[in-house]
């Protein structure tokens, strides 16, 4: 009889524990909150070329601290803007955006990428390494190009279109080279993801055809030219997916496409938009195929328009992407850089509206903002909105590629509001979190470093209330979470 009662109590206890946990769609607890940091043309970092090592580091720490104050938990850092590198590479020269001349290393030498990753992870934030797959020379009239740049070594791989030079996406050797670059990054650095933006085939220049006819004639594979171009992009994405996950299975692969996949007037699967150029028809990036085939782990469509826009309405597009994520992680790209550009973007409610809208949809897991410098002057008071309302509590990043199950933490009271915490096993641990439930709403009350052994709730800013419930969880390196343990 005692055994039966004990079993019943254990079952009831497990049921209550299960009910206590928020769903994975609870945006107050689980949410990606990222910022793009562009290095091309020194948009965000470093502020200008030729800064001292100390100034480069100081600027980066300042922007990280600003984003952390705003509640961000990830950065998307551009490390390969134009066939170059913001890190030491045997494959590509140092970027001109660092020291002012392509091929010129910092002096005295240091590795900016290793530094940036360390500082980012120190703050509990993810580091997504953003690379441009096809742009090779940003401006053929002005850009510094080193003798060791790949355009000098293999000029036959490149075409000029407008004032830029591009890797020719139709040449298999280009795919192979890009895979070598990515494998080098993934194998040498503790990044959390490889990230690519919307620049596949370039946006069309009116009256000019992209000059890839020779490559098409040489290797058309029986396809018409438009399908051949899409096939080229499909091939490199499929290969990169394999390269990344074979090198380090836990590293994510994400794409941030232009906001319109295809207009409904061209395809019944498309959005009710009037995009002048689209991913599928102009950039030859079939994002839906990549999601459907599982070739990418997350997608961040750039929805840089306001709600109510007459050609590309934010509401229409955010709903469309919510319905076309194919089970992959979906975050929304916000055009915070547009603050003040028209009446809609002078409205302080625009970004709050966009956040509320995406949080109301089940398949959207967060936001990414373009770009870092836009936050410097608190546009429309949006820094305040994030700090005081939308991101007032920290959030746990979504678990995209978990490689192991996280062990349940152990917690014991040592006196007052002081506790000893830890885990019994040796699984890689990223952090602990205190989850609270207040008036039916879950939130993350505090994130705690993985090496913490003793915590004090008052010191963490967690003021316990009798009407609330509190739990401790352990978070793994890939953001997987343990069972919830009630805090006594």
Segments (PLM) and residue ranges:
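Extracellular fibronectin type III
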Residues: 477-488
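Active-site clefts of carbohydrate-active enzymes
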Residues: 38-39, 252-275, 303, 317-351
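Polysaccharide-binding and catalytic clefts of secreted carbohydrate-active enzymes
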Residues: 72-73, 80, 123, 152-295, ...
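Substrate-binding cleft of secreted/luminal carbohydrate-active enzymes
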Residues: 284-310, 326-401
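The substrate-binding groove and active-site-proximal loops of carbohydrate-active enzymes
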Residues: 43-54, 94-110, 161-176, 221-234, ...
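Catalytic domains of carbohydrate-active enzymes, especially glycoside hydrolases
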Residues: 58-84, 188-191
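Aromatic-lined carbohydrate-binding/catalytic grooves of carbohydrate-active enzymes
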Residues: 70-107
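Active-site-adjacent "subsite" loops/lids of carbohydrate-active enzymes
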Residues: 30, 38, 42-58, 129, ...
């Amino acid at each position: 009889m005692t055994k039966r009662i004990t079993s019943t109590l254990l079952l009831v206890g497990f049921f209550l524990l299960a009910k206590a946990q928020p769903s994975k769609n609870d945006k107050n607890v689980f949410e990606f909150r990222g910022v793009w940091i562009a290095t091309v043309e020194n948009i965000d970092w470093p502020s200008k070329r030729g800064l001292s090592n100390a100034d480069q580091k100081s600027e980066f720490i300042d922007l990280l601290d600003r984003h952390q104050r705003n509640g961000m938990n990830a950065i998307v850092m551009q490390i390969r803007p134009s066939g170059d590198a913001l890190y030491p590479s045997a494959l590509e020269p140092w970027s001109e955006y660092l020291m002012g001349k392509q091929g010129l290393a910092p002096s005295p030498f240091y590795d900016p990428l290793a530094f940036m990753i360390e500082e980012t992870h120190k703050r509990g934030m993810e580091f997504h390494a953003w690379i441009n797959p096809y742009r090779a020379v940003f401006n053929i009239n002005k850009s510094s190009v080193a003798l060791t740049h790949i355009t000098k070594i293999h000029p036959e791989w490149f075409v000029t279109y407008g004032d830029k030079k591009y890797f020719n996406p139709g040449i298999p050797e280009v795919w192979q080279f890009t895979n070598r670059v990515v494998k080098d990054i993934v194998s040498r650095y503790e990044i959390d993801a490889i990230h690519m933006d919307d620049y596949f085939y370039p946006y069309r220049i009116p009256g000019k055809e992209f000059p890839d006819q020779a490559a098409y004639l040489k290797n058309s594979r029986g396809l018409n030219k438009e399908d051949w171009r899409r096939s080229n992009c499909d091939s490199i994405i499929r290969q990169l997916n394999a390269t990344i996950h074979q090198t380090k299975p836990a590293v994510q692969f994400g794409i941030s496409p232009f906001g319109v996949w295809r207009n409904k007037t061209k395809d019944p699967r498309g959005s009710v938009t009037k995009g002048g150029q689209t991913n599928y028809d102009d950039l030859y990036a079939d994002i839906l195929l990549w999601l459907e085939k599982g070739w990418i782990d997350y997608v961040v469509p750039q929805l840089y328009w306001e709600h109510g826009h007459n050609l590309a309405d934010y509401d229409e597009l955010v709903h469309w992407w919510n319905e076309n994520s194919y089970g992959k992680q979906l975050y929304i790209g916000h055009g915070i850089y547009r603050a003040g550009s028209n009446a809609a973007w002078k409205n302080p409610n625009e970004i709050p509206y966009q956040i509320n809208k995406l949080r109301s949809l089940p398949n959207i897991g967060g936001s990414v903002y373009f770009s870092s410098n836009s936050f410097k002057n608190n546009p429309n008071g949006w820094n305040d909105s994030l700090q005081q309302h939308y991101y007032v509590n920290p959030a746990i990043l979504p678990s995209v590629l978990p490689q192991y199950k996280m062990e349940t933490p152990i917690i014991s009271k040592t006196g007052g509001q002081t506790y000893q915490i830890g885990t019994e096993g040796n699984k890689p641990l990223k952090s602990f979190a205190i989850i609270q439930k207040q008036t039916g709403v879950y939130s993350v009350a505090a994130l705690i470093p993985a090496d913490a052994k003793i915590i004090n709730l008052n010191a963490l800013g967690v003021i316990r209330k009798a009407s609330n419930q509190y739990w401790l969880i352990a978070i793994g390196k890939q953001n997987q979470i343990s069972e919830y343990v009630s805090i006594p």
